[in-house]
Amino acid sequence: MMVSFTARANSNILAYRLLAYSEGDDIIEISHAAENTIPDYVAVKDVDKGDLTQVNMYPLAAWQVIAGSDIKVGDNLTTGKDGTAVPTDDPSVVFGYAVEEAQEGQLVTLIISRSKEISIEVDDIKDAGDTGKRLLKINTPSGARNIIIENEDAKALINGETTNTNKKNLQDLLFSDGNVKAFLQANTTDENKAALQQLMVSNADVLGLLSGAPSSENKVNIRSMIGAGVPYTLPAATTTTIGGVKKGAAVSASTATDVTNAVKDLNSLITVLKNAGIIS
């Protein structure tokens, strides 16, 4: 959108020179922009000091300005002497960059931009502290971690380079319970083990078993817990089923000397086997 207003020249204005606006007593005044400043606009005609002129400010993307020195394509530009355009290395006063070469005194076309190839040095960032500046200068993840994390043992852990000393220090850092530390270091005493059991197991019967000295009540409860509360009884054996058998009654060795007595002793043995359930 164009902005139009009447202004008074407080110095002789030359066409294609950079302008700066200021507030007069009753009117806006214009003059050549000061050196090393960012201008407000560019003059399109000559205006004598004290004359009134109509200023029409268009939202242009490019201006044509008289070069105050030799300019190369891509040069960052600021205001030179008498409102000319000159190259600069100071990003704080850049208002555009050249899109063509020009010698001193010639018109140069420039793009209005304060972001063209402006580089900011980390050390120039006033609000950044020393640690922040160091972090901004790092270009590797490991380097950034080394700045963010001060603890050497934690750094070793994150970098995957822990020594036994690092591991012990990390255990001390992460765990306050001495029994847990002893467990992690594989250096548990009987006292540590008992304390860890108390820490990890709430069931009194399991604790009794782990202690190696379960009470009779502990044993009964544990058997019930694992499904062994009722003794298992074998089924009776049959001719087709394997099962439990009783021990047969004692049978003396036969002393028979004839068939009749031998048969009698054999029948007695068969009876004992039947009674024991060994045979039908």
UniProtKB/Swiss-Prot annotation:
Its main location: virion. It is found in: Virion. GO terms for biological process: symbiont entry into host cell; virion attachment to host cell. Disulfide bonds: none annotated. The keyword Magnesium does not apply. Transmembrane segments: none annotated. Pfam families: Phage_head_fibr. It comes from the Viruses. Keywords: Host-virus interaction, Late protein, Viral attachment to host cell, Virion, Virus entry into host cell. One of its GO terms (cellular component) is virion component. Homotrimer. Forms a super helix coiled coil in the homotrimer. Belongs to the phi29likevirus major capsid fiber protein family. Protein that forms the 55 capsid fibers. These fibers are not always present and may have been lost in some lab strains. They may enhance the attachment of the virions onto the host cell wall. This is Capsid fiber protein.
